């Protein structure tokens, strides 16, 4: 297969794309893959490390208010579409996959104009503006939440799940919590506010750190985010927190290794995180970010809450006392954790990347049949 993959801006668009590529190369090792990203997004630092062929476009998002920058945005989009057409013409893909972000809008729109088969992967329960715009010309839309189905043309929608779920589900390794000087036998909570950290969550955790460190029934890995690490460390030092059951880190580079070893996750509710924890069956306390388009993180989180897989605390309601009460209640009641874990697993798609790969093959074959009629 010759495929162009495009998705950018955040890890939530990039990692599902890379998970699909991993599945593709497992099934068809001789496939040719070209990844097209933007100059502004994280893909510029992530994708080249994978060894994939990588090209970049100049794009930017629209301002939600009337602004002269939107004229520049339109101009950049037109230029990006034109450049995408040249790239597509030279690469000659069998299909183009978009996983979200403004850059995928330009690439998929160009592919559709050139009558190249296109598939959209929508990771959230609330569809992004770019994916809604592209759905009319797409061959299929692969969704991760059933709730997203009614936002696209019905005959094009396929529930595959988020490819990232399979990648973390299949991760093999001999990692142990002893690497953090923790006891593998104790119930463990991972507190993670995302790659950038979450200020209010960090404050809540710091405020209950003393109580947490005094009990010895369970343990925590607290990931602050790099920009908050020094501040949090200083606050904990002032409180004289230095406990063997409370590990503080700026970031986790080996999240795939750590997730299977924990009993509870406290985190934001981005699509990639939810794909990971449902594939693995991890109970969670979710604190949706209020700073996202269309409040999609809360919508994502409610999908798990409704099925008994997670508890949801809105950031506006978050307090140190509430969070400590909820996590200690869950970690103290194994039967409740097991029930939530089973509910999470039922929502998971541990074969999502393979499902998406098969969908791509199906679309390519359908287009071939159409051209031979």
Swiss-Prot record:
Q: Which UniProt keywords apply?
A: Cell cycle, Cell division, Cell membrane, Cell shape, Cell wall biogenesis/degradation, Glycosyltransferase, Membrane, Peptidoglycan synthesis, Transferase
Q: Is Cell cycle there in the keyword field?
A: yes
InterPro entries documented for this protein: GlcNAc_MurG (IPR006009), Glyco_trans_28_C (IPR007235), GlycoTrans_28_N (IPR004276)
Q: Which Pfam families match?
A: Glyco_tran_28_C, Glyco_transf_28
Give the record's pathway.
Cell wall biogenesis; peptidoglycan biosynthesis
Q: Which residues form a coiled coil?
A: none
Q: Does the keyword Transmembrane helix apply?
A: no
EC numbers: 2.4.1.227
Name the residues that bind UDP-N-acetyl-alpha-D-glucosamine: 10-12, 124, 195, 297
Q: Which Gene Ontology cellular-component terms appear in the entry?
A: plasma membrane
Reactions catalysed, semicolon-separated, are: Mur2Ac(oyl-L-Ala-gamma-D-Glu-L-Lys-D-Ala-D-Ala)-di-trans,octa-cis-undecaprenyl diphosphate + UDP-N-acetyl-alpha-D-glucosamine = beta-D-GlcNAc-(1->4)-Mur2Ac(oyl-L-Ala-gamma-D-Glu-L-Lys-D-Ala-D-Ala)-di-trans,octa-cis-undecaprenyl diphosphate + UDP + H(+)
What is this entry's stated membrane topology?
Answer: Peripheral membrane protein
GO biological process, any: cell wall organization
Where does it reside? Answer: Cell membrane
Spell out the molecular function terms from Gene Ontology: undecaprenyldiphospho-muramoylpentapeptide beta-N-acetylglucosaminyltransferase activity
- Bilayer-crossing regions: none
Q: Mind telling me which NCBIfam families this protein's record contains?
A: murG
Stated role? Cell wall formation. Catalyzes the transfer of a GlcNAc subunit on undecaprenyl-pyrophosphoryl-MurNAc-pentapeptide (lipid intermediate I) to form undecaprenyl-pyrophosphoryl-MurNAc-(pentapeptide)GlcNAc (lipid intermediate II).
Q: Which family does it belong to?
A: Belongs to the glycosyltransferase 28 family. MurG subfamily.
Give the protein's recorded name: UDP-N-acetylglucosamine--N-acetylmuramyl-(pentapeptide) pyrophosphoryl-undecaprenol N-acetylglucosamine transferase
Gene name in the database record: murG
